[in-house]
Curated annotation (Swiss-Prot):
GO CC terms in record: nucleus
Organism per entry: Pongo abelii (Sumatran orangutan)
Keyword list, A-Z: DNA-binding, Metal-binding, Nucleus, Repeat, Transcription, Transcription regulation, Zinc, Zinc-finger
Known function: May be involved in transcriptional regulation.
C2H2-type zinc-finger residues: 80-102, 107-129, 135-157, 163-185, 191-213, 219-241, 247-269, 275-297, 303-325, 331-353, 359-381, 387-409, 415-437, 443-465, 471-493, 499-521, 527-549, 555-577, 583-605, 611-633
GO MF annotation: an example: DNA binding
Top-level taxon of origin: Eukaryota
Subcellular location: Nucleus
Residue span of region Disordered: 1-29
Gene that this polypeptide is encoded by: ZNF271
InterPro entries assigned: Znf_C2H2-type (IPR050758), Znf_C2H2_sf (IPR036236), Znf_C2H2_type (IPR013087)
SMART domains: ZnF_C2H2
UniProt protein name: Zinc finger protein 271
Family: Belongs to the krueppel C2H2-type zinc-finger protein family.
PROSITE patterns: ZINC_FINGER_C2H2_1, ZINC_FINGER_C2H2_2
């Protein structure tokens, strides 16, 4: 582009400008001034401002190399020198205007009072107030207040990068970008913070840094009024509200709201980990991860909570911790009313609604909704247990399990219930417990109408529909739908009874059996019927009792359609159809279909007669015999029967359906 320049008119214009020292509210000839500054259009905005406010002579120096050969020769002759700064000028007027910059700023804005040493700078400044943007882009609808800004912008369309680094050959579209880039090679950091010893290569970085000291957050989100110290942060934040994800992965089409997230994501595909630790052999895909990792070696915890003094090695962990004190939960689910203190918790929660499980196990094809769950699951296959307890040496596959285990030694229960006096060592136990108070059952079965308070209960229940039994016994090949059932079953083979009663010498294979047994000693009956207020020591006994009031008989026979309130009654009934008599008398070899029939029969051999007639004091070994005898006493009240020794009632819980032999458990009968 050849620049046409009229030296005479320019010199005359500068002289007339120099003579006019009055305050300018309205420039006498804006067109003339605009024409004068157009040769500077190749300069960056930051440098241009310095040129216009420093000296007219420097202005000519900047564009002189764009002129033709004849005009360049004119610029080589610079007889007018500044004694103070040593600068040279082609014309006297240039030197005159330059000297004014040492002391004078005669051009003042009538809107805000800001003063300038040259009129052209005032003209540009006034466009801030007027909003005037006279320079339009031919490629798009954008307009600019300065021609230099237009030229820079047009390079977006043309791809022109005229400024090249001598060190590495990298090219830039703006000279200011080249200057900043060259500071990488020189190490120059000319912008120093007045509050601390930090220096910066860019002024904008210094401005951002100083907001750490001042606490200034000038950028506000118009959706939620959240404040930010950097404009880029508010732009990123607003994408939470809009859902915009403009950065897409070429490999898997996953989209991201931030370009930095895309770059990090792409390293999953490439496997690139460019940040190695110099203390150990670990490498990281993110520099921030390396910095965090190094604190493991140094033990540094630079982030301290103002509320409780607790220190953390990561700022993000401190922010999450502070939400315990503030109760802030800034991440709401758009499917339900739940809110979360962490974005990762929201993402994991949303997979409950979508059913998404993006993390497959390459050993067994099991799918997981969270990557951390996959990592934990892998340890089942590898047997790895990297977390060891300092107290007892026990090892764990998960760090969370070690932390929970250590609370056995310390007795710590940091999660108290706000509704009662109970405390818990695990937060998950508190959440489950609170559902007793609220009655919440958030986990619904999609096969039937049943709901559950815990997700694990739903998973177990769904196996009733699917028939899945993923847990196999190595000793007898028996399969179970629940891992807990397998563990209990394996104790049949091992004979293990790890739960000891402190009141007597009895041991139990299940903790639940110990708890039930201990109620014999305490007399506790915590389960009360809401209909008749009768109390029971076991929940299962209450459930069976309530069916007396409701008439519910949920156990139907497939052969004849007869229904029963108890599953054990159904099993006994089905033996009528099959003819099965698994209970044999040791004394005479007679077989019976139910255990109760065997017990009644054994009283004959023992000579036991617990049923006595109140009319004649005669005793009988079986209740049926007493009933027949009572018919002898005609007209007598057949209901005046005193059971000298109340007969034992046997339930399905007494003879565990989990592979135990009922004949060996006769002493486990309970009275309910």
């Amino acid at each position: 582009m050849e620049i046409q320049f009229n030296y005479e008119s320019q010199e005359h214009h500068l002289l007339s400008d120099g003579e006019n020292k009055t305050k300018i509210g309205k420039p006498a000839s804006e067109e003339g001034i605009t024409a004068k500054i157009e040769p500077l259009t190749e300069e960056s905005s930051s440098l241009r401002e310095n040129v216009l406010q420093d000296s007219e002579g420097r202005e000519f120096c900047e564009f002189g190399d764009k002129l033709n050969e004849k005009d360049q020769n004119v610029f080589k002759r610079r007889p007018h020198n500044c004694d103070e700064y040593g600068q040279s000028f082609v014309w006297n007027t240039g030197l005159f205007r330059h000297r004014k910059t040492h002391c004078e700023k005669p051009y003042e804005c009538d809107k805000c009072g800001k003063a300038f040493s040259v009129s052209s700078a005032l003209v540009l400044h006034q466009r801030i107030h007027t909003g005037e943007k006279p320079y339009s882009c031919n490629w798009c609808i954008k307009s600019f207040s300065r021609s230099s800004d237009l030229i820079k912008h047009q390079r977006v369309h043309t791809g022109e990068k005229p400024y090249k680094c001598d060190e590495c050959g990298k090219a830039f579209s703006q000279s200011s970008d080249l200057i900043i880039h060259q500071r990488i090679h020189t190490g120059e950091k000319p912008y120093q913070c007045s509050h601390c010893s930090k220096s910066f290569s860019q002024r904008s970085d210094l401005v951002k840094h100083q907001r750490i000291h001042t606490g200034e957050k000038p950028y506000t989100c118009n959706q939620c009024n959240k404040h930010f110290s950097q404009s880029s942060d508010v732009i990123k934040h607003q994408r939470i509200h809009t859902g915009e994800k403009p950065y897409k992965c070429d490999v898997c089409a996953k989209a991201f709201s931030q370009s930095s997230d895309l770059i990090l994501h792409q390293r999953i595909h490439t496997g690139e980990k460019p940040y190695p630790c110099n203390q150990c052999s670990k490498s990281f895909s993110q520099n921030s991860d390396l910095i965090k990792h190094r604190r493991i070696h140094t033990g540094e915890k630079p982030y301290k909570c103002n509320e409780c003094g607790k220190a953390f090695n990561q700022s993000s962990v401190l922010i999450l911790h502070q939400r315990i004190h503030t109760g802030e939960k800034p991440y709401p689910c758009d499917q339900c009313s739940k809110t979360f203190s962490r974005l990762s918790d929201l993402i994991n929660h949303q997979r409950i609604h979508t059913g998404e499980k993006p993390y497959p196990c390459n050993q067994c094809n099991k799918m997981f909704s969270r990557r951390s769950d996959l990592v934990k699951h892998h340890r089942i296959h590898t047997g790895e247990k990297p977390y060891e307890c300092d107290e007892c040496g026990k090892t764990f596959s998960q760090s969370s399990n070690l932390i929970l285990h250590q609370r056995i030694h310390t007795g710590e229960k940091p999660y108290p219930c706000s509704d009662c006096t109970k405390s818990f060592s695990r937060r998950s136990d508190l959440v489950k417990h609170q559902r007793i108070h609220t009655g919440e059952k958030p986990y619904a079965c999609n096969q039937c109408d049943k709901s559950f308070s815990q997700s694990s209960d739903l998973t177990k229940h769904q196996r009733v529909h699917s028939g899945e039994k993923p847990y196999h016994c190595n000793s007898c090949e028996k399969a179970f739908s629940q891992s807990s059932d397998l563990i209990l079953h394996q104790r049949i083979h091992t004979g293990e009874k790890p739960y000891l009663c402190t009141q007597c010498s009895k041991s139990f294979s299940q903790n639940s059996d110990l708890i039930k047994h201990q109620r014999i000693h305490t007399g506790e009956k915590p389960y009360k019927c809401s209909e008749c207020r009768k109390a029971f020591s076991q929940c299962s006994a209450l459930t069976l009792h309530q069916r007396i009031h409701t008439g519910e008989k949920p156990n139907p026979c497939n052969e004849c359609g007869k229904s029963f309130s108890r599953h054990s009654d159904l099993i006994n009934h089905q033996k009528i159809h099959t003819g099965e008599k698994p209970y044999k008398c040791d004394a005479c070899g007679k077989a019976f279909s139910t255990c109760t029939d065997l017990i009644e029969h054994q009283k004959i051999h023992a000579g036991e007669k617990p049923y006595r007639c109140v009319q004649c004091s005669r005793s009988f070994s079986q209740l049926s015999e007493l009933t027949i005898h009572e018919e002898v006493h005609c007209g007598e009240d057949s209901q005046n029967v005193m059971n000298v020794r109340k007969p034992l009632v046997y339930t399905s819980t007494l003879f565990s359906t989990r592979d135990t032999v009922p004949g060996k458990n006769l002493m486990n009968a309970v009275d309910y």
